[in-house]
Amino acid sequence: MADPVPPASTAPPAAPAATTATPPPPPPPPPPKALRPQNQALRMLGLPNLPNKLPSRNWMIFWTVSASITAAIIYDRREKRRNIAKWRHAVEHLAAEPITDKLGLEQPRKLTIYLSAPPGDGLRVAQDHYTEYVKPVLAASGLDWEFVQGRREGDVRAVVAERLRKVRRGWENKEEQDPNREPTKDELIEIYRQQRGIKDYEGVRGDVVIGRHTWKEYLRGLHEGWLGPLVAPAEPAPLPPTPAPAAAEGSTSTEDKPAEEKKEEEAPKPKRPPQPKPYNTTSDYSSETLHPLTPQELTPAVPIREPHILGFLNTPTRMVRFFNRRSLADDIGREVAAVCLATHREFQQQTNPDAPSTDSVQYEQAKELEWEEQDWPKKVWKEDEADADKEVTEKIHIKPVVMDPRLAHRMRRFALTPEDEDRVSKIKVPEEEVEGWIKGSLRKACHWGYDKAFNKKKLVPLEDKDVE
């Protein structure tokens, strides 16, 4: 008989023996990559190493605005140089024309440049404006010119009037010839020319007037010189000085001696010559007579733009003009080219039936560059006798232009003809004349490399006779 199956054991299984082994440690991290050396200049500016992504929003705005302003300035300056070069090429053929007088006994054509300090500023501003826009075209034409510069209001008026009075005195032969008087520099030059038989230029000369303020003085000087008297009017007798009390003089005589001695020791500073007073006024034009020898056509003239505005609140206007100097260069170049080519026309006039009889005729001379008066400082329009400049004998800038019909019809204005306009429009300025320093340097470097690589000069062996 088989043995019975033993019953299953009900006792719990024995627990496994505890292990004393520990798990292995994790592998060490890889060594960090070596950082790129940082530019110290960028680090001081707060710029780390440039990442491989677009800059932030603020940086994008900054670079966009900076690039736009830089591009606008570069484009405007390049086009300004292009416009000036175009008008230079339009008149440069005049410099190549041969002189008709082979003996040199005829004076060349000479222009007169009138410029003065703009209201509220100095003369240097007008000189810089002339050098930047007017001089390049004049220099390319090969013409000669002279300057009339005014530092004070009325200086140009006085020079223009005195020159015309000198011409009238020569017609009437009423200029006093004092044998004991020393001749001036201009008179010595004129005497030398007469002795050598040098003739004056008989063609069209020309006057270039820069700025509305100078144009007003120029017109005032024309009327004073052609219509005014040849002798200065008598000045009113000055009032006798009132004597000071004797007691006050005795009490301060001992105290003022040291001050008087100091004043005598100091060298007196040279003073400017006084400005000549005008010989007539605008109300005298109608009652004055015009000399019968006055030419039917006066010397042609042209006013040149000189936009000049001051003040912090006018910054937007100044910024617009700063980015649009190319149009200013084109307008001034056109006017100066007309002067060089000696093409002129009559000044126009309009009739206004609604205006009073005295102002029914509007002359073009009075409207030239009238918009520039809006840019003048407010203090120019304040005519205060207490603060007025004692050296200025007449206020011309703030007064309206008064024209006499006899002179208005004789005046001529320089202007280009349609034929000249068509000829100038076909002028193409090469890029090499207007490009900047960076682009020009790159172009020269490329040309130099191309010549070195492909345009090698062939060396020709010398013969013995060439060496000897």
Curated annotation (Swiss-Prot):
<feature type="topological domain" description="Mitochondrial intermembrane">
    <location>
        <begin position="76"/>
        <end position="468"/>
    </location>
</feature>
<dbReference type="GO" id="GO:0005743">
    <property type="term" value="C:mitochondrial inner membrane"/>
</dbReference>
<comment type="function">
    <text>Essential component of the TIM22 complex, a complex that mediates the import and insertion of multi-pass transmembrane proteins into the mitochondrial inner membrane. The TIM22 complex forms a twin-pore translocase that uses the membrane potential as external driving force.</text>
</comment>
<keyword id="KW-0811">Translocation</keyword>
<comment type="subunit">
    <text>Component of the TIM22 complex, whose core is composed of tim22 and tim54, associated with the 70 kDa heterohexamer composed of tim9 and tim10 (or tim8 and tim13).</text>
</comment>
<keyword id="KW-0812">Transmembrane</keyword>
<dbReference type="InterPro" id="IPR021056">
    <property type="entry name" value="Mt_import_IM_translocase_Tim54"/>
</dbReference>
<keyword id="KW-0813">Transport</keyword>
<keyword id="KW-0472">Membrane</keyword>
<keyword id="KW-1133">Transmembrane helix</keyword>
<feature type="compositionally biased region" description="Pro residues">
    <location>
        <begin position="22"/>
        <end position="34"/>
    </location>
</feature>
<feature type="region of interest" description="Disordered">
    <location>
        <begin position="1"/>
        <end position="34"/>
    </location>
</feature>
<feature type="region of interest" description="Disordered">
    <location>
        <begin position="233"/>
        <end position="291"/>
    </location>
</feature>
<feature type="compositionally biased region" description="Pro residues">
    <location>
        <begin position="235"/>
        <end position="244"/>
    </location>
</feature>
<feature type="transmembrane region" description="Helical">
    <location>
        <begin position="59"/>
        <end position="75"/>
    </location>
</feature>
<keyword id="KW-0999">Mitochondrion inner membrane</keyword>
<dbReference type="GO" id="GO:0015031">
    <property type="term" value="P:protein transport"/>
</dbReference>
<keyword id="KW-0809">Transit peptide</keyword>
<feature type="compositionally biased region" description="Basic and acidic residues">
    <location>
        <begin position="254"/>
        <end position="269"/>
    </location>
</feature>
<keyword id="KW-0653">Protein transport</keyword>
<dbReference type="GO" id="GO:0005737">
    <property type="term" value="C:cytoplasm"/>
</dbReference>
<feature type="topological domain" description="Mitochondrial matrix">
    <location>
        <begin position="53"/>
        <end position="58"/>
    </location>
</feature>
<dbReference type="GO" id="GO:0016020">
    <property type="term" value="C:membrane"/>
</dbReference>
<dbReference type="Pfam" id="PF11711">
    <property type="entry name" value="Tim54"/>
</dbReference>
<comment type="similarity">
    <text>Belongs to the TIM54 family.</text>
</comment>
<keyword id="KW-0496">Mitochondrion</keyword>
<dbReference type="InterPro" id="IPR050187">
    <property type="entry name" value="Lipid_Phosphate_FormReg"/>
</dbReference>
<protein>
    <recommendedName>
        <fullName>Mitochondrial import inner membrane translocase subunit tim54</fullName>
    </recommendedName>
</protein>
<feature type="transit peptide" description="Mitochondrion">
    <location>
        <begin position="1"/>
        <end position="52"/>
    </location>
</feature>
<feature type="compositionally biased region" description="Polar residues">
    <location>
        <begin position="279"/>
        <end position="289"/>
    </location>
</feature>
<feature type="compositionally biased region" description="Pro residues">
    <location>
        <begin position="1"/>
        <end position="15"/>
    </location>
</feature>
<dbReference type="GO" id="GO:0043231">
    <property type="term" value="C:intracellular membrane-bounded organelle"/>
</dbReference>
